[in-house]
Amino acid sequence: MQENKQQQRAIAHNTGPALILAGPGSGKTFTTVERVRYLIEVHHADPSHILVITFTKAAARQMRDRFFARMDNQFFPVTFGTFHAVFFHILKTSCHYNGSSILKEKEKREYLRAALLTLPKKFYAQNDGKMDQEWEQGLLSEIGFIKNIGKLPADFTSEYVSRQEFMRIFVSFQKQLAQEKKLDLDDFAAAVCHLFRTNPAELARWQREYSYLLVDEFQDINAAQYEAVKLLCGGKRNLFVVGDDDQAIYGFRGSDPAIMRQFLKDFPEAKQIFLSVNYRSRAGIVETAGKLIGQNRERFPKQIVAGQSTSDERQDVCFVPEATQGARRMQGEKSTLPIPTGTASGISAAAFGTSWLPLSTDRSVLVCGFQDRRQEAETVADEIGKTLRQGKSCAAIFRTNADAVWLATALKCRKIPFLWKEKPKNPYETPVCQDLLAYLQFAMEGRKRKDFLRIMNRPCRYLSRQMLPDAEISFSALRRAYAQKPYMQEILHRLEADISRLAKMDLYAAVHYIRRGMGYDAWLKENAGQTPSAGESRQGQERAPAGARAHAAGKLERDLEAADFFQEQAREFQSLTELEEAMTAYEDQMDQNMADAADTAASGTTGAAFTTLPIAELVTMHGSKGLEYDAVFLPCCMEGVVPHKKSKNQAALEEERRMFYVGMTRAKKELYLSYTKGTKETPGFASRFLAECGWKEPKR
């Protein structure tokens, strides 16, 4: 392997601080491994005093394996570890902690619940006496966030409770940790900093232990980790950091790309080296991604160039690309597995009047706008099938897991093998889908009590379960039970008429009528706190904590998305029986498809009748970090999805742009960007990021 001049400068760096800005596909792992080798073989550094810190176990393992392979599998006692592993080793050695000292997830939730018992019930959601799990996880994430950024809890604005209440929760949580002598993972860095500041002897000990520090993915570091690393490197200042501020996407965990710029202030003598050649992606992908990320203001200015030609072949390969799960190199002939190429209805994308249009001169970047998500999912699934038949690795990358459901369904229907790395819960099992199903079942399959109990007060109809003694519901019996309440007669008459209408409709129309005609969507808004409920004034609603209002808005958004999903799925079936069978089979089919895909990846075959075949992967933008594929699909490139509608300020928008950039730069040969246009009633708009890439949407 022959390194380029930029890599050579980084590898040959001896002592003192250095900041290596490594763009996508620029060989940062190769450079880091070679630098460790160079320290040992050329500068005669003691390998036992070299510490390489990464963010994930997989990255640490990969770097260690590549180092030992480079050293002809001879053993050298270099330490490769994650921040958590390294910091816990220090705390275990110096402070006598052990494995049982680490707070388990179950214990963490118990501590939080104990802290919440001191709060008025109005501050948290209740569901049959149980706390809203999403709300609970949100609070735990906020507690971890302020620990990582080193912020005082009194200065933090929670999305869920007031500042005063959050302060009480945080203090109680930390008090329980101290009493039980436990350590939260998010406390590791702060605990190491406390040890180093209060015990100079221990600080000196660990500074002697690690004379050379190398930090990978430095853009993902948080304030607490950075402070600990600065203390550890000591007066020798042998701190070699590698990262790319354009790929900083973990702000929700406290990571801050501004720390990279702060590094140059803290270490003004630091050598700064740019690894600017992307050996992964074709020129069109590199240029298009560069246009996008150039819109960010808070970044190191840099110009990334392609190390590939505009053809599919590499022009200048000077290092072995990073091994990834996504980039499986298949041996032998390309697959002839008969994956269907048409959509479920046999209609191609072209028949809808859509086509993939080139965004780059080498046609490595293609864009397409679709009418709705179903059409987008079917067309992308067909394109994935074509890509797999050509023996290429590919992935569909989404902003959130929920966005992947449409494509997963389309792939499943076509029996296209895929691996869903972060599969969410069955979308049919959401409370909203179960409500809509209960309405359909009550109208079309008999008046069962269990279905009526679920729907009778959604929206509110003032019906009591005590008036429902029988297994089947009779509206005549209900009218007799409420004979003394004239207003209930009108409610029951309207409900019976609505149920009769539903029984005569097709599934799609029935769901639409439930939502609009029977007031289910309006009830969702009231239930989420978006409209004043009975007896509540608009002023009283507005006095709720801002965090509580934001949480309510998020809940409504998810509920309406679930209703949209169910309604679109209902369109596909001729009868309720067909829909029920599909819902029942969904989880089993999905699990089986994923198992088959995993077996395919493990064995490299699809059975005796077929040759080798890659499998498609579905992954989020966060989960795609560090991976690469021949072809990448980025569906759902719409405003409100990416950038996410919650991105209200410049910093949040820039992180969204970095996420999109990370997704784009996973592609080696082909990059497909798509969006949906929607209808007049519910229009969709292409993401501003497409325009920043140079895309001009055709006139409708």
Where on the chain are the PLM-derived regions?
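Conserved helicase NTPase motor core
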Residues: 1-12, 16-20, 51, 59, ...
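Conserved short internal alpha-helix adjacent to the catalytic or cofactor-binding core
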Residues: 36, 363, 413-416, 424-459
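P-loop NTPase Walker
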Residues: 1-98, 204, 258, 287-290, ...
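ATP-hydrolysis module of ASCE/P-loop NTPase motor domains
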Residues: 75-77, 95-186, 210, 272-274, ...
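Helicase P-loop NTPase motor core
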Residues: 20, 24-32, 36, 269-271, ...
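Conserved helicase core region in the C-terminal RecA-like lobe
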Residues: 79-89, 214-217, 242, 400, ...
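Accessory C-terminal helicase-associated subdomains
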Residues: 337, 343, 390, 480-623, ...
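Helix-hairpin-helix
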Residues: 453-475
